[in-house]
A protein has these predicted regions:
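Non-catalytic cell-wall polysaccharide-engagement segments
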Residues: 3-7, 11-20, 56-164
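Conserved alpha-helical segments that form or flank metal/cofactor-binding pockets of metalloenzymes
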Residues: 24, 34-47
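Alpha-helix boundary recognition
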Residues: 31-32, 149
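Solvent-exposed coil/turn segments that connect beta secondary-structure elements
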Residues: 33-36, 56-58
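Solvent-exposed, flexible loop/coil residues
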Residues: 41, 45, 54, 78
Length: 164
């Protein structure tokens, strides 16, 4: 299994910041959490590459952004990160209509890992009530968000905090 160098991964994330205004620390954090920068990793559910993109997510990105990414594009590190970032930001944009940016990012990260249907079910059953977060949100999903936050903080320290 081949790993993408940290510096190269960061450059891809910076390109997304330059091209789309995406938070490079957030994108980097998702790459580390999803794949530990292993380029050709594939999950048991069929998610592929650095950002662990599923066919469903690929179709959603193509539909939302009117792009023509292919399954072959998932094998190209820079494209895999771009597709994953677009998918994540699709959900950030969606949740920002109703919530603050902080909450929208939290929910988008949950969707990225758990799926929209599960997150919507959680919200419909008291997910907005802070008292019920630990009761209704599976521990591994909360842990996933914590891992992304940890890598976000790490990336800001490692790469410098001048972006975003």
């Amino acid at each position: 299994m081949k790993k993408l160098a940290r510096k190269q991964c960061w450059e891809y994330c910076l390109n997304l910041y330059r091209d789309y205004g995406y938070d490079p620390y957030l994108i980097y954090a998702v790459v580390e959490t999803e794949s530990n920068r292993i380029i050709d990793i594939q999950s048991h559910s069929g998610a592929y590459g650095l950002m662990q993109i599923t066919e469903i997510a690929l179709r959603e990105v193509n539909q939302k952004y009117k792009t023509n990414y292919t399954l072959e594009d998932l094998k190209i590190p820079e494209k895999n990160i771009e597709i994953g970032a677009k998918y994540l930001y699709r959900w950030i944009d969606y949740f920002e209509i109703e919530y603050s940016n902080f909450v929208a990012v939290f929910l988008a990260i949950l969707v990225y890992n758990w799926g929209y249907g599960n997150v919507q079910h959680w919200l419909d059953n008291g997910g907005e009530d802070n008292q019920k977060i630990t009761e209704l949100l599976p521990f591994e999903k909360l842990q996933y968000n914590e891992d992304v936050i940890w890598w976000y903080v790490w990336a800001k320290k490692y790469f410098g905090g001048e972006y975003v």
